[in-house]
C-alpha cells in the first residue's frame, strides 16, 4: 500500500514531461524564427507531429525494455553493446552542442540585461566561462535537481504568461506582414525552420526514463508522454507566434533577448529587465542539469 502511495499518477507525470522539455530551448527561438518569418508556424506543426511520434516510440521502448540507460539501454536491447555505444555517443555529442547553445543564450540575455555590447570574441569567452562555471558548480544529482526544479520557473512564467496575456497586444497585420519577409521559397523556409523548432523538444527522450515510479506504467506512461509533448507544443507555438505579432519583425530578428523585448513592448523596460533576469536564471539552471547529464 505504501509503495503504491509513493508512485505518481498520470497527471503528475504529464506535468513533469512538459517541465522536462520546457528548459532553455525556447528562449532564443523567437529571434531565430523571425529571420525566416511567421511562415515558421508550419514548421512548428510538422515538428509537433514528429516529436509526438518520437515520444510515443520512446514510451513503447520503455515498456518493452527494462534496461537502464535510456536510449542506450533501448538500443542495447535490440542491437547489443555496439548499439548502446552508438546511441550514447551520438546523444553525448548532441548535448555538447546543446549546452554550448544554452550558454550562448544565457550570455545573450545577460548582456541585454546589463546593457552591455559584446563583440563576437567577448561572447565566446563569456560562453566558455559560463560552461566551466556550470561544470564546477555541479555538486551532484540531488542538489542539481533542486536547483533545476527552482530555476525552471524562470522560463515557465514568461512563456506561459505571454501565451495567455500576450493576445491583448497582438497585432494581426504585423503578424501577416512578417509571414515571409525575405521571400524565401516556401519549402526551403519550412525546412530551415524545422531544424530550429525541433531544438525546443530536447528532453522528450528522458520523459519515460523512470517508469518504475509510475502507477500502471503500461497505460499511464504513453498517455503522459503524448500529453506532455502535445502540451509543450501548444505553449511553444502560441508563445512564439504571439511575440511575432507584438514586436516588429526586424527588431525581433536582431534581438538577443526576445522574451524580454516582448514584455518591454507590452509593459515597460523594467518588466522587460525582470523577464531577462528570469531567463538568465533559467538558462543557468538548465545548463547545470544538462552538464550533469553529460557527466
Question: Where are the language model's segments positioned?
Answer:
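Membrane-interface "cap" regions at the ends of multi-pass membrane proteins
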Residues: 1-31, 35-39, 51-59, 68, ...
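Hydrophobic alpha-helical transmembrane segments in multi-pass membrane proteins
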Residues: 20, 24, 28, 43, ...
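Membrane-interface helix termini and inter-helical loops of multi-pass transporters
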Residues: 29-35, 108-116, 170-183, 249-257
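Hydrophobic transmembrane alpha-helices that form the core helical bundles
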Residues: 31-35, 53-130, 134-138, 143, ...
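Helix-loop junctions at the membrane interface of multi-pass solute transporters
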Residues: 31-32, 77, 135, 190, ...
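Junctions where cytoplasmic loops transition into the N-terminal start of transmembrane alpha-helices
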Residues: 39-40, 150-154, 211-244
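TM-loop-TM module centered on a large, flexible mid-protein loop between adjacent transmembrane helices
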Residues: 73-76, 80, 112-116, 226-288
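Membrane-interface loop-to-helix entry segments
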Residues: 110, 120-172, 184, 225-230
Amino acid at each position: 500500500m505504501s509503495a503504491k502511495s509513493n508512485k505518481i499518477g498520470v497527471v503528475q507525470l504529464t506535468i513533469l514531461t512538459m517541465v522536462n522539455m520546457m528548459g532553455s530551448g525556447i528562449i532564443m527561438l523567437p529571434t531565430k524564427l523571425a529571420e525566416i518569418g511567421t511562415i515558421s508556424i508550419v514548421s512548428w506543426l510538422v515538428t509537433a507531429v514528429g516529436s509526438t511520434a518520437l515520444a510515443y516510440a520512446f514510451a513503447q521502448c520503455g515498456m518493452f525494455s527494462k534496461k537502464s540507460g535510456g536510449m542506450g539501454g533501448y538500443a542495447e536491447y535490440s542491437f547489443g553493446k555496439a548499439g548502446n555505444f552508438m546511441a550514447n555517443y551520438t546523444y553525448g555529442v548532441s548535448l555538447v552542442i546543446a549546452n554550448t547553445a544554452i550558454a550562448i543564450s544565457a550570455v545573450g540575455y545577460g548582456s541585454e540585461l546589463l546593457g552591455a555590447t559584446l563583440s563576437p570574441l567577448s561572447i565566446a569567452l563569456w560562453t566558455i566561462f559560463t560552461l566551466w562555471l556550470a561544470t564546477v558548480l555541479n555538486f551532484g544529482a540531488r542538489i542539481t535537481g533542486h536547483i533545476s526544479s527552482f530555476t525552471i520557473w524562470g522560463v515557465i512564467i514568461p512563456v506561459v504568461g505571454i501565451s495567455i496575456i500576450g493576445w491583448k497586444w497582438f497585432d494581426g497585420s504585423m503578424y501577416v506582414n512578417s509571414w515571409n519577409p525575405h521571400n524565401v521559397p516556401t519549402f526551403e523556409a519550412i525546412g530551415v525552420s524545422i531544424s530550429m523548432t525541433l531544438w525546443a523538444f530536447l528532453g522528450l527522450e528522458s520523459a519515460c526514463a523512470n517508469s518504475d515510479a509510475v502507477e500502471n506504467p503500461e497505460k499511464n506512461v504513453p498517455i503522459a508522454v503524448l500529453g506532455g509533448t502535445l502540451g509543450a507544443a501548444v505553449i511553444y507555438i502560441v508563445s512564439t507566434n504571439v511575440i511575432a505579432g507584438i514586436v516588429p519583425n526586424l527588431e525581433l530578428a536582431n534581438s538577443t533577448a526576445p522574451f524580454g523585448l516582448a514584455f518591454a513592448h507590452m509593459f515597460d523596460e523594467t518588466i522587460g529587465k525582470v523577464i531577462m533576469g528570469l531567463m538568465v536564471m533559467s538558462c543557468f539552471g538548465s545548463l547545470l542539469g544538462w552538464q550533469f547529464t553529460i557527466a
